[in-house]
Amino acid sequence: MRSVFYVALVFAVLARSSTVAAFPHTDESQLLAVTSPDSATHTKRSLRAAGQEVVQSTGNGNGGIFKSTLTSINKVVHKPEIKLGGLIEKAKIAQAAKAFKNKATGKK
C-alpha cells in the first residue's frame, strides 16, 4: 500500500515540475485557469440537446425547465397475441422426437 502512495507522490511531483518547466513565468500558468466569457457561454449552450427550449416556470424569469420541441416518437405498439399452448405442444413433440433420435443412435 505504501508503494502505491509513493508512486502517486512521485507522479504528482513530476507532473508539477513539468508544468513549472513548461511555464517559466508564473503569470503564464495562471492564464490557463481563466476562461473567456465567450467560451463559458458556448459551454452553457452545448449542454442543451438539439430540439430543446427553456420554458420559464416562474414569472420573474428565474428558473426554468427543458422542454422538447420535437414530436414524441414513443408510441404504443400492440404486440400480437401468441397462443402459448400451441407452442408448448410443438416443443414437447420436438423434445420427444429428439429423445427418440438419440435413443435410436445410442447418444445420451
UniProtKB/Swiss-Prot annotation:
Organism domain of life: Eukaryota
Keywords linked to the UniProt accession: Secreted, Signal, Virulence
Primary site of residence: secreted
Segments carrying motif Calmodulin-binding motif: 79-83
Cellular localisation: Secreted; Host cell
KW Signal (keyword) present: yes
Signal peptide as annotated in the record: 1-22
Ranges annotated as spanning the membrane: none
CC terms in the record's Gene Ontology section: extracellular region; host cell
Positions of short motif RxLR-dEER: 45-58
The keyword Secreted is annotated on this UniProt entry: yes
Domain description: The RxLR-dEER motif acts to carry the protein into the host cell cytoplasm through binding to cell surface phosphatidylinositol-3-phosphate. The amino acids 79-83 in the C-terminal region of are important for binding to host calmodulin.
Family label: Belongs to the RxLR effector family.
The protein's role, per its UniProt record: Secreted effector that associates with calmodulin to interfere with plant defense-associated calcium signaling in hosts.
Subunit relationships: Interacts with the host calmodulin.
Name of the protein this chain belongs to: RxLR effector protein PPTG_18954
